[in-house]
Design a protein with these regions (language model features):
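Bacterial N-terminal signal peptides
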Residues: 7-17
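Positively charged n-region of N-terminal signal peptides that target proteins for export
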Residues: 1-4
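Terminal leader/tail segments of proteins
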Residues: 23-155
Length: 155
């Protein structure tokens, strides 16, 4: 996860006290990939006055590390276009200082093809696996993979 996402997620984790009922989006996926899984935190991302999604982060009981497997699940609270989700993801990676235009374009193409439009109640889940790949799910169904450790590190 990139610095921006870590900062956003840290704020979400701190907001758990304010959103104790924030449901986990898909704990079954976390259990498939993580031994002795634990929920690290959850919270709601709000942009201006719109609630966008509930995020839940899962890691092994030993704790979250960016270089080890983890699962980040987002339960959407509004309708969004998949292309907009992909575009925002690439913008965040670019804002981290990543400037390789060819790789950004490749990642943008992959994510735009991969991310579906979402509606209130849909969930998207990203898994950072042992090999450093990012595996994406919509609900319980796998929708694709980005097999690029640099992408995974920045995502």
């Amino acid at each position: 996860m990139g610095r921006i996402y870590v900062a956003v997620f840290a704020a979400l984790v701190m907001s758990t006290a304010f959103f104790p009922g924030a449901a986990s989006a898909n704990p079954a996926i976390a259990k498939r990939y993580l031994a002795d899984v634990q929920k690290v935190g959850d919270g709601v991302l709000t942009y201006l006055f719109w609630d966008v999604y509930r995020a839940t982060l899962y890691a092994p009981a030993a704790g979250w590390r960016r270089d080890a497997p983890f699962v980040l699940s987002l339960a959407y609270l509004r309708d969004l276009k998949g292309a907009d989700i992909a575009g925002r993801t690439i913008a965040e990676i670019r804002d981290q200082g990543f400037t390789d235009k060819a790789r950004l374009a490749d990642w943008s193409d992959r994510l735009t093809a991969l991310f579906p439009d979402v509606a209130d109640g849909d969930s998207l889940t990203a898994v950072r696996d042992e090999a450093g790949r990012t595996i994406f799910y919509r609900g319980a169904g796998r929708i694709g993979i980005v097999d690029d450790a640099e992408f995974t590190r920045r995502f």
